[in-house]
């Protein structure tokens, strides 16, 4: 099931996404987030996390880093980018 979902997202990235102008306000992009979430948390939780991310991605949201969290969550991951910046500054 995991492979089927990842292949579906790859199909979207290859055939559908290029037709539209870039609109994702987060890094990584919503489709890459979906793939990472599926690979890290499994098909059901990953699909739920990816869908929640797509619903968060709109013109009125605050853009920025939103990495796949270590633990399952449907909310935006605010803490990890700050930790990453602290590690990079050392």
Swiss-Prot record:
Subcellular location: Cell membrane
TM spans (from-to): none
Entry keyword set: Cell membrane, Membrane
Superkingdom per UniProt: Bacteria
InterPro entries: Membr_insert_effic_factor_YidD
Membrane topology type: Peripheral membrane protein
A single Gene Ontology CC term: plasma membrane
Keyword Membrane among record annotations: yes
Protein task: Could be involved in insertion of integral membrane proteins into the membrane.
Protein family per UniProt: Belongs to the UPF0161 family.
Protein name: Putative membrane protein insertion efficiency factor
